[in-house]
Amino acid sequence: MPQNILAQSENYYVKADYETAELYAKDGDRRVACVGEHYGDAADCIIDSGERFCVTVGCGYIVYLLKPPFEDYASGKVTAQWFESDRGNGSTVWYDSVRQISPSQIELTDENGGKKTVTVGLK
């Protein structure tokens, strides 16, 4: 498996490549989609224990739903494939880590040690 792995699960892994985070299928080592872009690089990532979503953090956070049709992340685009927050317009938060605390909740830790809980709505 390549270097710069941010997270992995049974069937997927997320690899950091400069400011992008890309999802790969372990079967065939195949690129699936870009799941995030973070100014200053992605700091951390989790893949949901049920492989329903992944979350990348750094400059803000991006929750990307792991369901077809997979499409490459594009900043500011409104889509059902992902949602993002704390990424600009005067509300930028720098996150250092993310962890899953329940099947539908994640906990983000910012650069000052502050915690934020986010509920992931799955459609």
Where are the predicted features?
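Short hydrophobic interaction/assembly module
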Residues: A43-P69
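Beta-strand-connecting loop/turn residues
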Residues: E19-T20, R52, C59, P103-S104
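Surface-exposed loop/turn elements that mediate protein-protein interactions on large endomembrane-trafficking
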Residues: M1, D17-E37, I62-N89, T109-K123
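Repeated scaffold domains used in trafficking and secretory/extracellular systems
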Residues: M1-Y12, G36-R52, V78-P103
